[in-house]
């Protein structure tokens, strides 16, 4: 019996959240083509035979002077030290520079190099990219090109991970797929709906605060606030005749209901808090974990 923690690390938009959902077999983490979509750690748990693998999805590595982004990067770096193993994700379209920066981290556990988005190219380009990483072969334990549209890759990745985990009793009940607080999961489902429903810079200047969750036998009631920094952004989030906020609510309820398997009553409000992203205490205590 093995059990251990595996941190998913890589630059923004490398496909970490998509891979987490693929490996766990459930939609846990928000997925968006917009960069820096992931703001909180989300843990997913997968069983492979008798072995338990706890995945930690983290914000993407990037350079930024903004307080919120710095805290997001700190979350990602800290998760490396907390892990038994790292999956470093690199898009098939990227060069090796991000990986070389990762190798400069002194205290890091063993890692597997995952090449993502291979479905967007051909076998020749995949082989060429594998050749570019071959010079680092003494650094990684394995390198795996992955196409998450094909289920066969799931077993291959989990098998390689299980080989490297320590012998340990289960950290969590093997029947659960996440130990992340439901508030954080529901919050990200709502934020993902915001990302899909509005364009431009609005999602980057907004976040979600879950105020209350009331669970009953057949229904869960959720009260939440979408926080943004200007009245003009608030009007965009509301939309003409309330169309946008209605669309956000419909998408959010479906995602939460699909996950929780119960009927959802969602009360969404929009709250303006100017400069919230520069309020370090607010960001630390409410938005980034």
Curated annotation (Swiss-Prot):
Q: Give the residue ranges for region: G2.
A: 36-40
The record's keywords, sorted A to Z, are: Cell inner membrane, Cell membrane, Cytoplasm, GTP-binding, Membrane, Nucleotide-binding, Ribosome biogenesis, RNA-binding, rRNA-binding
Query: How does the entry describe its membrane topology?
Result: Peripheral membrane protein
According to the UniProt record, where is the region G5? Answer: 146-148
Q: Name one GO biological process term.
A: ribosomal small subunit assembly
Tell me which InterPro entries the record gives. G_ERA_dom (IPR030388), GTP-bd (IPR006073), GTPase_Era-like (IPR005662), KH_dom-like_a/b (IPR015946), KH_dom_type_2 (IPR004044), KH_sf_prok-type (IPR009019), P-loop_NTPase (IPR027417), Small_GTP-bd (IPR005225)
Q: Give start and end of each KH type-2 domain.
A: 186-274
Matching entries from Pfam families are given as: KH_2, MMR_HSR1
Task: Name the positions where GTP binds.
Answer: 10-17, 57-61, 116-119
Quick one: a GO cellular component term?
plasma membrane
Segments spanning the bilayer are: none
Main localization, broad class: cytoplasm
Q: Does the keyword Cytoplasm apply?
A: yes
Q: Which HAMAP family match?
A: GTPase_Era
Q: Give the UniProt family note.
A: Belongs to the TRAFAC class TrmE-Era-EngA-EngB-Septin-like GTPase superfamily. Era GTPase family.
Subunit structure as annotated in this protein's UniProt entry: Monomer.
- General function of this protein: An essential GTPase that binds both GDP and GTP, with rapid nucleotide exchange. Plays a role in 16S rRNA processing and 30S ribosomal subunit biogenesis and possibly also in cell cycle regulation and energy metabolism.
What name has this protein been given in UniProt?
A: GTPase Era
UniProt source species: Campylobacter hominis (strain ATCC BAA-381 / DSM 21671 / CCUG 45161 / LMG 19568 / NCTC 13146 / CH001A)
Q: Which gene encodes it?
A: era
